[in-house]
Structure formats: structure tokens, C-alpha cells
């Protein structure tokens, strides 16, 4: 079977606090490491989706409704469901990596980086499906 968990692939989180949220793989580790002896992936995802926007709304209201809250986390492959979609969101690998979990300040910085990049991509109007809440 081919390796399909690749960076840029959209996944659904199945377990934990962010279950039901969409995320994108930043880095995948198929063979595991010494501290995590199972296949896992570093993902960046959307915790709070942007709200619906209509043409009748003003600029300030649209700006307020277009905010996104993100998360950065390492997940076991068992807790991720891959989709057929992939998005091209160029997250800065120096800011968003596995070392951020050692220091809360670095984690905040990584979350901020993901938030900024997600909002940029959202404003272009591409990948609409990724920025909509999964109805279940």
C-alpha cells in the first residue's frame, strides 16, 4: 500500500479535544521515533471556523467574522482520517515543528503562524471546503 499521509494532505481529527476538526499535515513520521514508537503526524488545524459572510455586511463585521482559531498538535495515525483533498498552505517549518511542545511561548508562536497563514488562504477564496465546519 502506498504512503498517502503526506504534508499538505487534509485530515479529519477523530479523537480528543479537536475531534471533528479539519487539519493539514505539516510533517509525517511513518516509522515512529524513540519517544513515539508509532506512526504519527504533526498537524495544524482549525479550532474555530470563520462565520458566514454576506454582501450586506460592512467591512468591520466581515473582518470580525473572518477570524480563525488554529491548533498545532501531534497525532497518532489511528486518530486521523485522511481525505482526498490537499491544500497548499506554506507553514514556516522553523516555527511549526515538533520542538514547539517543549515551550509554551514557542507553541503560541506556532499557533499564531498557522492562524495567519490560514486566514491569508481563506481570504483568497480558494479551498472553500477546508474552511467550512464539518456537519455531522
Curated annotation (Swiss-Prot):
Alphabetic keyword roster: Acetylation, Cytoplasm, Endoplasmic reticulum, Ribonucleoprotein, Ribosomal protein
Chain positions found as N6-acetyllysine: 27, 93
GO MF annotations in UniProt: structural constituent of ribosome
A cellular component term, taken from the record's GO annotations: cytoplasmic side of rough endoplasmic reticulum membrane
Database matches in PROSITE patterns: RIBOSOMAL_L27E (PS01107)
Subcellular location: Cytoplasm, Cytosol; Cytoplasm; Rough endoplasmic reticulum
KOW domain sequence ranges: 5-40
GO annotation, biological process: rRNA processing; translation
Subunit structure: Component of the large ribosomal subunit. Interacts with RRP1B. Component of the large ribosomal subunit. Interacts with RRP1B. Interacts with DHX33.
PANTHER family: 60S RIBOSOMAL PROTEIN L27
Family statement drawn from the similarity comment of this UniProt entry: Belongs to the eukaryotic ribosomal protein eL27 family.
Entry function: Component of the large ribosomal subunit. Required for proper rRNA processing and maturation of 28S and 5.8S rRNAs.
Protein name (record): Large ribosomal subunit protein eL27
Organism: Canis lupus familiaris (Dog)
Amino acid at each position: 500500500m502506498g504512503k498517502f499521509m503526506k504534508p499538505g494532505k487534509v485530515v479529519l481529527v477523530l479523537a480528543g479535544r479537536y475531534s471533528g476538526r479539519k487539519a493539514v499535515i505539516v510533517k509525517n513520521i511513518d516509522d515512529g521515533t524513540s519517544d513515539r514508537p508509532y506512526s504519527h503526524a504533526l498537524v495544524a488545524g482549525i479550532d474555530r471556523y470563520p462565520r458566514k459572510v454576506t454582501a450586506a455586511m460592512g467591512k468591520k463585521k466581515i473582518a470580525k467574522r473572518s477570524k480563525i482559531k488554529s491548533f498545532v498538535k501531534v497525532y497518532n495515525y489511528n486518530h486521523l482520517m485522511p481525505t482526498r483533498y490537499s491544500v497548499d498552505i506554506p507553514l514556516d517549518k522553523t516555527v511549526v515543528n515538533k520542538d514547539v511542545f517543549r515551550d509554551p511561548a514557542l507553541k503560541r508562536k506556532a499557533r499564531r503562524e498557522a492562524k495567519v497563514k490560514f486566514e491569508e488562504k481563506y481570504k483568497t477564496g480558494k479551498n472553500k471546503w477546508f474552511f467550512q465546519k464539518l456537519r455531522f
